[in-house]
From Swiss-Prot:
Mitochondrial matrix compartment residues: 1-4, 70-88, 154-173
Stated name of the protein: Cytochrome c oxidase subunit 1
Organism of origin: Sepia officinalis (Common cuttlefish)
InterPro entries: Cyt_c_oxase-like_su1_dom (IPR023616), Cyt_c_oxase-like_su1_sf (IPR036927), Cyt_C_Oxase_1 (IPR000883)
Quaternary structure (record): Component of the cytochrome c oxidase (complex IV, CIV), a multisubunit enzyme composed of a catalytic core of 3 subunits and several supernumerary subunits. The complex exists as a monomer or a dimer and forms supercomplexes (SCs) in the inner mitochondrial membrane with ubiquinol-cytochrome c oxidoreductase (cytochrome b-c1 complex, complex III, CIII).
Similarity comment text for this entry: Belongs to the heme-copper respiratory oxidase family.
Gene name as annotated: COI
Membrane topology: Multi-pass membrane protein
Catalysed reactions, semicolon-separated: 4 Fe(II)-[cytochrome c] + O2 + 8 H(+)(in) = 4 Fe(III)-[cytochrome c] + 2 H2O + 4 H(+)(out)
GO cellular component: mitochondrial inner membrane
Pfam families: COX1 (PF00115)
Length: 223
């Protein structure tokens, strides 16, 4: 699975690099190249999501973690190999949803933070932002399952006599990252779910006209 993570991460990295080149060519000379601000915003948004959720996290945590953590602990494999499998296979459909979000309507041009009111029904009436939110949900589920797996592996699968203070710093870095992920990702999931219901079910969590607070989203997002 570690190897699959690397392959997926490299493929996503090439996709992200092509988006990055589009951004650089647009900004690299005076005047407009794309001639469409919405399209440019969609490229910037997709670039942010692809590079974070489909390049950095799968390679740095998924790839190196799956290869090195069991090796450094003296474990034969991760604690939950089948959950590990599922963590990986949630990522391709997540990336597909993200690419679909940029293809339908005029794309999700909200910036990678998906702030309301830019991500509200008024600015993005079609399903593009909803697809981006579902993509984030899948990537988040994948990350949370992976984090649970890493924490359990590091706590329970060490050689006998291998104390926590003797673990390599890489294992510690994965361990602490996984704990922080488990703390923060459910809050982000709550924020984008509230945004989803604001868009589709007439709630007003982030809509001032209904007593909501758009700044609340920023608090939840950056938590």
């Amino acid at each position: 699975i570690g190897t699959l993570y690397f392959i997926f991460g490299i493929w996503s990295g090439l996709l992200g690099t092509s988006l990055s080149l589009m951004i650089r060519t647009e900004l690299g000379k005076p005047g407009s190249l794309l001639n469409d601000d919405q399209l440019y915003n969609v490229v910037v948004t997709a670039h942010g999501f692809v590079m974070i959720f489909f390049l950095v996290m799968p390679i740095m945590i998924g790839g190196f973690g799956n290869w090195l953590v069991p090796l450094m602990l003296g474990a034969p494999d991760m604690a939950f190999p089948r959950m590990n499998n599922m963590s990986f296979w949630l990522l391709p459909p997540s990336l597909t949803l993200l690419l679909a979000s940029s293809a339908v309507e005029s794309g999700a041009g909200t910036g990678w933070t998906v702030y309301p009111p830019l991500s509200s029904n008024i600015s993005h009436a079609g399903p593009s932002v909803d697809l981006a939110i579902f993509s984030l949900h899948l990537a988040g589920v994948s990350s949370i399952l992976g984090a649970i797996n890493f924490i359990t592996t590091i706590m329970n699968m060490r050689w006998e006599g291998l104390q926590m203070e003797r673990l390599p710093l890489f294992v510690w870095s994965v361990f602490i990252t996984a704990i922080l992920l488990l703390l923060s990702l459910p809050v982000l999931a709550g924020a984008i779910t509230m945004l989803l219901t604001d868009r589709n079910f007439n709630t007003t969590f982030f809509d001032p006209s209904g007593g909501g607070d758009p700044i609340l989203y920023q608090h939840l997002f950056w938590f």
